[in-house]
UniProtKB/Swiss-Prot annotation:
Gene Ontology CC: extracellular region
One function term, GO molecular function aspect: ion channel inhibitor activity
Signal peptide range: 1-20
Keywords of the record: Amidation, Disulfide bond, Ion channel impairing toxin, Knottin, Neurotoxin, Potassium channel impairing toxin, Secreted, Signal, Toxin, Voltage-gated potassium channel impairing toxin, Voltage-gated sodium channel impairing toxin
Family of the protein in this entry: Belongs to the neurotoxin 10 (Hwtx-1) family. 47 subfamily.
InterPro entries with a match to the protein in the record: Huwentoxin-1 (IPR011696)
UniProt name for this protein: U18-theraphotoxin-Cg1a
Length: 86
């Protein structure tokens, strides 16, 4: 009986220990993620984009991103033009 109780106690301590380590790991990820999001936002803000009408309102293909073309019929939005590559 004593060895079973000791084994259960050791397993309980190990469970609590690993749970605490996981929580600490998750906490560090959560602390780091706002900084990562802010740095990514700066990258996207600093990048100039040629395409301005991705979600609608285009009148010509040049307003769309590469490999997208403006639809000729309503609803006017940028759609894939069937090409690949850079």
């Amino acid at each position: 009986k004593a060895s079973v109780l000791i084994t259960l106690a050791v397993l309980g301590v190990m469970f609590v220990w690993t749970s605490a380590a996981e929580l600490e790991e998750r906490g560090s990820d959560q602390r780091d993620s706002p900084a990562l999001i802010k740095s990514m936002a700066k990258v996207f803000q600093s990048e100039e984009r040629e395409c301005t009408k991705l979600l609608g309102g285009c009148t010509k293909d040049s307003e769309c991103c590469p490999h997208l073309g403006c639809r000729k019929k309503w609803p006017y939005h940028c759609g894939w033009d069937g090409t690949f590559g850079k």
